[in-house]
Regions:
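Membrane-interface loop-to-helix entry segments
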Residues: 152-214, 278-282
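TM-loop-TM module centered on a large, flexible mid-protein loop between adjacent transmembrane helices
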Residues: 98-99, 105, 136-147, 214-234, ...
Length: 366
């Protein structure tokens, strides 16, 4: 039976590093700071840049949605400082699991390890489903699903997961090269959207930058932000509370930069390259989100972006540039390179668990 002392047992940094030198558990150190930066950008920027920006601007922040992304980036930057320090000190594949094991002990590490598995598994499922929907748009509206009696089989989602699984099995170097190509396409689509959107830009659409607060039944009750509940302001949209609510939503647009830390064990110089990769990817992503937000809210009035199904393409459609929707749909396929990069941390997070001395030996790299 586990004892309290055993549950609080920690694993030293030195032991964690020694475990990575075992012949059966050693990973190739192929990655550089550039590879990690590409990895981080590929994971963080998803189709949300085409949807989240429009919905947040139309229902919460108005033109100040760009400021909301800056506030969210600052919060992520503070978190990134912790990841950068831990990853450079403990350059092991387990990421938060390993960090918790070295500081809080075995029990907390066990909980965090399963949290990571759940997080990445759910992320892969959701993103694969989104990729399948965009594939349907590219195929002319034909949904990539098959109906087997009462069961609906999404072969598009299953196919992308299978392809990415095979790609990752070939090694991280090839996967990082594919990520580089996907990121190039992704950034190319974003730059094209910024250039075309700038032709419809009107500075008057950015006024007022922070719209006055107004009642909103959709932001009342359980749907209101914690800050609105604490201050007793009730269900309101826009204003400063709307801006802060938008920042909390925008924070989730940055989720994924932390997985760069899972590649520390495969990095040539983790003490130098992992922090560089984390902050470089975060900086690039922040610039992309802020630029898209500014162009979007400069193209149309924020009141024209209110609705459940508004996207970045909505702003172009209001100007008659419906052809941009096709570019966004095609561009969203490599954007969903997240399918390839979100699964990558899962085996990396799993890898350090079997190194525990009490792990089942068939699963252990010992």
């Amino acid at each position: 039976m586990p004892t309290a002392g055993g549950m609080l047992r920690t694993k030293s940094v030195e032991q964690s590093i020694r475990d990575t030198d075992e012949p059966d558990a050693k990973l190739r150190k192929d990655l550089t700071a550039r590879d990690l930066t590409v990895f981080g950008v590929a994971v963080v920027i998803g189709a949300g840049i085409f949807t989240l920006t429009a919905r947040t601007a139309g229902t919460m922040a108005g033109p100040s949605v760009s400021l909301a992304f800056i506030l969210a980036a600052i919060a992520c930057g503070l978190t990134a400082l912790c990841y950068a320090e831990f990853a450079s000190t403990v350059p092991v594949a387990g990421s938060a699991y390993t960090f918790a094991y070295a500081t809080f002990g075995e029990a907390i590490a066990w909980i965090i390890g399963w949290d990571l598995i759940l997080e990445f598994a759910l992320a892969v499922s959701v993103v694969a489903k989104g990729w399948s929907q965009y594939l349907g748009d590219v195929l002319g509206g034909m949904a990539p699903v098959a109906h087997l009696g009462s069961v609906t089989f999404d072969w598009g989602a299953v196919t992308i997961i299978a392809i990415v699984g095979l790609l990752l099995a070939t090694g991280t170097k090839l996967s990082s090269r594919v990520s580089a190509i996907a990121v190039a396409i992704k950034l190319g689509v974003i730059v094209l959207i910024l250039i075309v959107g700038a032709t419809y830009f009107k500075a008057s659409n950015l006024t007022p930058f922070i719209p006055p607060a107004e009642p909103s039944p959709k932001a009342d009750g359980v749907h209101q932000s914690m800050l609105a509940w604490l201050t007793g302001s009730g269900g309101t949209s826009f204003g400063w509370l709307g801006l802060l609510s938008a920042a909390s939503i925008a924070f989730f647009a940055f989720v994924g930069f932390d997985v760069v830390a899972t590649a520390a064990e495969e990095t040539r110089n983790p003490q130098r390259d992992v922090p560089r990769g984390i902050f470089a990817s975060l900086a690039i992503v922040t610039v992309c989100y802020v630029a898209v937000s500014l162009v979007l809210t400069g193209m149309v009035r924020y009141t024209q972006l209110q609705g459940e199904n508004v996207t970045l393409a909505t702003a172009f459609a209001l100007h008659g540039a419906t052809w941009v929707k096709n570019i966004i749909a095609i561009g969203a396929l490599p954007v969903h390179r997240r399918d390839g990069d979100v699964p990558r941390p899962d085996p990396r997070a799993l890898r350090d668990g079997p190194r525990r001395p009490d792990s089942p030996q068939p699963r252990a790299y010992r």
